[in-house]
Amino acid sequence: MNKKSKGTTIETLNYIDLFCGAGGFSLGFQKIGFENIFSIDIEKDFCKTYKYNFPNHKLIEKDISKLTEQEILNLTNNKGVDIIIGGPPCQGFSIAGNIGRKFIDDPRNRLFKEFVRIVDIVKPKYLMLR
């Protein structure tokens, strides 16, 4: 989608939201005029809230590690992506609630690699990792 401003066409920037949760990042990006390509999260309740907040967004409710390269390319329609945003789970790195558990054993700690994998496939102009 393009916008016009005083006779000048301004291209709408787009984004992908990984580990989207209820959509906090998407809300901010939507408010400044970005267009959502797709968002993904595995948590059912988060996805339910996201769908409520963004009924017109393409939401994938799936384990991000199961998202294939071909699925990603299909979701982006092989077009350029301006920015990938996301916040992989960090609870496994926190000392809070991890008494008696080694952070290295928490499978959530590997999810940042999925963010990197998707960035490598899509090659966006920018990324924002929280």
PLM feature spans:
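Conserved active-site and SAM-binding loop architecture
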Residues: 1-130
